[in-house]
Design a protein with these regions (language model features):
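Short S/T/G/P-rich N-terminal loop/turn motif that feeds into the first structured element of a domain
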Residues: 1-50, 56-70, 77-98
Length: 98
């Protein structure tokens, strides 16, 4: 499995996460269609927030990153949020507990 973490902070980040929260159903529908998606999580932090996307393979990660970029460009382009800090890697342990 592969993971990408996209961290938004600085200019426009708080406003971006306000908008993401307001449109979370649309965001979930957009990201839910990613092929091979294992999990997608949006987290608000003090200065903005971050997303964590876990997919079965690199293809899913690439699709998820592209969908996120397109959603932000279409729905939040006027906010002027800085580009996210992106960290990617291979999952070494994964646990789901309900």
């Amino acid at each position: 499995m592969q993971t990408v973490l996209r961290r938004y902070s600085g200019k426009g980040a708080k406003e971006l996460f306000d908008l993401l929260e307001e449109h979370k159903v649309d965001v979930e529908e957009t990201m839910g269609g990613v092929k091979g998606l294992v999990t997608y999580t949006l987290v608000r932090s003090g200065d903005g927030g971050f997303s964590v996307t876990v997919c079965q393979d690199r293809t899913g990660i690439d699709e998820g990153v592209q969908r996120a970029k397109e959603w932000i460009a279409k729905n939040a382009g006027s906010i002027g949020a800085a580009a996210p800090e992106v960290t990617e890697g291979t999952v070494i342990a994964h646990l789901n507990k309900s």
